[in-house]
Amino acid sequence: MKGSPISQFSKTSINALTRPWKKYRDGELFYGLSKVGNKRVPLTTKQGNKTMYKGTRASGIGRHTKFGGYVINWKKVRTYVTPDMVNFELKPYVNANVPPLKHEFKGFSGGPLDPRLQLLKIKEYIVNGRVQSEGATDTSCYKERG
């Protein structure tokens, strides 16, 4: 059977593009350029793998620059007002009388970064294991709770 020329089906070139025998359900003509349904919907966390995290756009405090940096918009940064501490009823978890830990590096010119001090600390760790500092073992300033 010989195929019929297209001029017998349509009168103009625009009508040649349409397929009047294929229509959408609402009556629009189908031009063959789209597929059924929208395939470009946003990806959800249920569709991604276990490492996918989208977030909720809750903490966007700035913007990315085109050079890979990040500029913070200080109007979007959260600020918290602390209450006045005079006659404040809530108490801290840590006792206010706890002495601060002070590290002394006598005989080491580089302070905490001196290689001789690091070597000495490694030797002590090998011999004794992990040992708390003297200030941390002072239990006289501890307050028993409960």
From Swiss-Prot:
Residue stretch of the organelle transit peptide: 1-16
Cellular location(s): Mitochondrion
Pfam families reported for this sequence: MRP-L27
Annotated Gene Ontology cellular component terms: mitochondrial inner membrane; mitochondrial large ribosomal subunit; mitochondrion
GO terms for biological process, alphabetical: mitochondrial translation; translation
GO molecular function: structural constituent of ribosome
Signal peptide start and end residues: none
Family: Belongs to the mitochondrion-specific ribosomal protein mL41 family.
Name of protein: Large ribosomal subunit protein mL41
Source organism: Saccharomyces cerevisiae (strain ATCC 204508 / S288c)
